[in-house]
């Protein structure tokens, strides 16, 4: 988040070119900074399907993630009664984040009736505060099995962030980076075609959702982040 998530801006410190994913985008610092404008009130958006263009942009696993100033969280909750629940949240602006909203307000509704296995696919790894919320949820709910699958690592060079990620795993969460198969799964289960307007501004009937087409270097960037995550969790 641009000033949330402890200053959660998806841009990260520049490093030597050989250490960067090959399709890294320009950092925000390279462009002229726009004038600051007042942001509308914060909100967490909840739904079942993400527009395809939003998914492709927000979940792209580049390192310099200019413009990606929000977090998307797609969740699957499986309970012992063979019920499966899916949905997604996205946050706006600078207050609570999607992770905190999910683990504080959404997930407890599913934990009142017994054990649950939860997988969250997030566009970026959690900030320090959200990591603390996740750890608290795990410690309160011993019957919760949690897996967090991340497209990118947020400010992974910061010692507080590294410690927060280790704290999540110590609390019982499985952390890993998204791979091609995960993108295909999320595309199939959480993404919908973009709304297209005709010449009169009326929404056209959406067509069928096509197959997920990976961007260049998706798998290579995933391996890059896997190595960084492994370093953090040692």
Where are these regions (language model features)?
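Zinc-dependent deaminase catalytic domain
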Residues: 1-234
